[in-house]
């Protein structure tokens, strides 16, 4: 068995040497790097084993680096198995996979023979198989027999076609199976006939040798007979003869010694002649028999040649049947795919109708959205102008509010003085009533009454002068303008709500600022008073209130920071969801384009007239509009939310900065060092908040 395997390996190697390759391929060491095998596969099927695949095979995998050789062999073997499964629809489950490590390390001939066997199967099943088969037929008969045995082994190890469709398994399977069985029987009969032909040719050669020897003997005997006849004639002519002793024996007469001697010699020669004639007849019979055998052998050889020609025709027919069977399988598979594609096409038609209806609605929505976008673009510049005007008005309002607070504080002080004077007046009136009895006391009471009246009149006049009528008119006018601006912003409801919230916070902060200014003025007034006990009590109350206010401010600041962090996290989440949505839209777009391309191919394959009638570009445009319209409302909602949050953050930060700066200005002027130290530090600027 090992000898047969080695013969098969050398036969496959001799066949592989006939290929025209640039790489060396004369022995196992040169084939172990896989480069020659890859070039051969590229020559067999260039459409599958492409030049880019061939470039992956490293030409430097020679010498002692067996790992590079093994990497090349792995690529070649994997591509071979893929070719058998994908192109030829064959499975190699029962075929023993070649051990690539033995080939790479030791150049094992048995494993290399399996690999060459797979390459041979690829050669006889490729598009140029006829030329390779003729090259194989041009080799020696022994090599042809070994190559045929290798192909039969490849077929007998389970090299079967892949799964057939149910419709073609009855017809195509029976035809191909019968053709393969007839081919195997014919190949076996051809082998037997070839062996018988070789044996008969050997016999003919041996008989020809024997016949030549017998003919040589015949010619020798004829020459000897001629010599004897010539000698006999010469002896008959010579009447006198000389004996051995030189004495004449006399004439040849009956009864003489010479006559008897010659008679005896003649009898011996006749016997020899009869024997030679018998041998000649035997040789003639043998020659006739050999000629008849030779003619019979020639007839058998002609019959064998005819049978071999029939076998070749049968092989060609089997190849044609195989190709037709493969084409039938491919056509059936294509038919099934076309049926599925036709069903998909009908579904796509229905979907296209639905999408066209949707697209009409989306076009209307898109037009509305474009009008809204134009209106928004027009109002955006106005909003910026209004923002600047609002900031200027806020600054003016803060200045006026500070003045108003001072005036109100002065008014309260004057009112308190007025109340004190009224109380003093009442007490003086009571004293006047009590001290009316005496004239001196009446005069003194009258004088004091006049001074109280003058002080009251002066206080009333001062209080009337200190009333902020212009300031109140200006504040009302500013509020009316602010309200008109809010109403004039159109459909910007979210921004209006944010502005209202900001205004409410601003009013709340103004109230707090007002109370703080009142406390500051009261503290300054208390500091100017002379009573130390009242001063200490008021200082303690004010310090306590300021500490509470500071704690409230810090809590509000922490809440604002946490709210800002939550807004930032929401913005990040929205950005990530937006990016994922864009990726989904891109994937859907690519999938849609593939579906449209498949639909075009199906329509072209079914009916090219219908394919020409359909406007694929319009369909694609409608689908793209549908996808855009589906994604646009969601994006507009996201943008609106992001804009509202950004505007809210900007307004809050700007309001905080403005309040802090005003507090710092109001608290820093006209205060003592200790009073300034008790105040809370201003918040960070907007740029610092943004940087965080």
Swiss-Prot record:
Localization per Swiss-Prot or TrEMBL: Cytoplasm, Cytoskeleton; Endosome; Synapse
GO terms assigned for molecular function: dynein light intermediate chain binding; microtubule binding; small GTPase binding
Residue numbers spanned by region Disordered: 161-180
InterPro entries in UniProt: CH_dom (IPR001715), CH_dom_sf (IPR036872), Hook_C (IPR008636), HOOK_N (IPR043936)
A Pfam family assignment: HOOK_N
Protein keywords: Coiled coil, Cytoplasm, Cytoskeleton, Developmental protein, Endocytosis, Endosome, Microtubule, Synapse
Coiled coil: 135-576
Biological process, per Gene Ontology: cytoplasmic microtubule organization; cytoskeleton-dependent intracellular transport; determination of adult lifespan; endocytosis
Domain Calponin-homology (CH) intervals: 6-123
Main location: cytoplasm
Cellular component terms per the entry's GO annotation: centrosome; endosome; microtubule; synapse
Function: Involved in endocytic trafficking by stabilizing organelles of the endocytic pathway. Probably acts as a cytoskeletal linker protein required to tether endosome vesicles to the cytoskeleton. Involved in modulation of endocytosis at stages required for down-regulation of membrane proteins that control synapse size. Not involved in synaptic vesicle recycling. Required in R7 cells for boss endocytosis into multivesicular bodies (MVBs). Has a role in regulating adult longevity.
Quaternary structure and interacting proteins, as annotated: Homodimer. Interacts with microtubules via its N-terminus.
Membership in a protein family: Belongs to the hook family.
Domain-related comment: The coiled coil domain mediates homodimerization.
Protein known as: Protein hook
Source organism of this protein record: Drosophila willistoni (Fruit fly)
Gene name tied to this protein: hook
């Amino acid at each position: 068995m090992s000898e047969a395997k080695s013969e098969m390996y050398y036969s496959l190697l001799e066949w592989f040497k006939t290929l025209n390759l640039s790489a060396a391929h004369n022995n196992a060491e040169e084939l172990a790097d896989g480069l020659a095998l890859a070039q051969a596969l590229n020559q067999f099927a260039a459409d599958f084993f492409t030049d880019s695949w061939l470039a992956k095979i490293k030409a430097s995998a020679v010498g002692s680096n067996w790992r590079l050789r093994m990497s090349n062999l792995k690529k070649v073997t994997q591509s071979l198995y893929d070719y058998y499964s994908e192109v030829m629809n064959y499975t190699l489950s029962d075929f023993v996979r070649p051990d690539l490590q033995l080939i790479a390390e030791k150049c094992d001939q048995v494993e290399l023979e399996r690999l060459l066997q797979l390459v041979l199967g690829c050669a006889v099943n490729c598009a140029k198989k006829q030329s390779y088969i003729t090259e194989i037929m041009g080799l020696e008969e022994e090599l042809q027999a070994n190559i045929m045995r290798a192909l039969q082994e490849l077929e007998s190890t389970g090299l079967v076609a892949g799964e057939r469709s149910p419709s073609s398994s009855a017809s195509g399977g029976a035809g191909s199976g019968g053709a393969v069985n007839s081919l195997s029987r014919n190949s076996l009969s051809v082998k037997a006939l070839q062996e018988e032909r070789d044996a008969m040719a050997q016999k003919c050669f041996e008989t020809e040798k024997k016949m030549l020897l017998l003919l040589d003997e015949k010619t020798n005997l004829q020459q000897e007979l001629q010599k004897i006849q010539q000698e006999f004639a010469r002896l008959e002519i010579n009447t006198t003869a000389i004996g051995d002793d030189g004495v004449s024996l006399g004439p040849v007469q009956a009864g003489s010694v010479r006559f008897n001697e010659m008679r005896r010699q003649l009898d011996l020669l006749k016997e020899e002649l009869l024997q030679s004639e018998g041998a000649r007849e035997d040789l003639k019979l043998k020659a006739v028999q050999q000629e008849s055998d030779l003619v019979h052998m020639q007839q058998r050889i002609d019959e064998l040649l005819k049978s071999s020609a029939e076998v070749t025709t049968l092989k060609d027919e089997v190849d044609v049947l195989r190709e037709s069977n493969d084409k039938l399988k491919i056509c059936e598979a294509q038919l099934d795919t076309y049926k599925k594609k036709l069903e998909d096409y009908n579904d796509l038609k229905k979907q296209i109708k639905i999408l066209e209806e949707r697209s009409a609605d989306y076009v209307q929505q898109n037009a509305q959205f474009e009008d809204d976008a134009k209106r928004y673009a027009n109002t955006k510049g106005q909003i910026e102008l209004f923002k600047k005007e609002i900031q200027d008005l806020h600054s003016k309002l803060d200045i006026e509010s500070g003045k108003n607070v001072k005036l109100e504080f002065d008014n309260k002080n004057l009112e308190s003085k007025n109340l004190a004077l009224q109380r003093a007046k009442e007490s003086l009136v009571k004293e006047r009533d009590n001290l009316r009895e005496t004239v001196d006391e009446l005069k003194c009471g009258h004088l004091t009454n006049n001074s109280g009246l003058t002080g009251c009149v002066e206080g009333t006049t001062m209080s009337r002068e200190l009333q902020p009528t212009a300031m109140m008119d200006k504040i009302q006018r500013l509020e009316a303008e602010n309200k008109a601006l809010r109403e004039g912003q159109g459909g910007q409801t979210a921004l209006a709500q944010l502005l209202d919230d900001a205004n409410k916070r601003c009013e709340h902060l103004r109230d707090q600022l007002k109370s703080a200014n009142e406390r500051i003025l009261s503290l300054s007034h208390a500091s100017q008073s002379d009573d130390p006990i009242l001063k200490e009590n008021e200082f303690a109350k004010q310090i306590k209130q300021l500490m509470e206010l500071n704690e409230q401010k810090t809590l509000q600041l922490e809440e604002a920071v946490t709210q800002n962090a939550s807004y930032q996290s929401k913005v990040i989440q929205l950005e990530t969801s937006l990016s994922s949505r864009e990726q989904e839209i891109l994937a859907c777009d690519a999938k849609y384009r593939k579906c449209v391309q498949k639909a075009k191919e199906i329509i072209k394959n079914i009916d090219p007239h219908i394919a020409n009638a359909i406007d694929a570009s319009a369909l694609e445009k409608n689908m793209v509009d549908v996808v855009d319209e589906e994604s646009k409302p969601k994006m507009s909602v996201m943008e609106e939310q992001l804009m509202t949050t950004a505007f809210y953050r900007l307004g809050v930060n700007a309001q905080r900065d403005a309040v802090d700066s005003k507090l710092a200005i109001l608290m820093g002027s006209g205060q003592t060092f200790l009073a300034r130290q008790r105040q809370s530090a201003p918040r960070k600027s907007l740029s610092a908040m943004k940087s965080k």
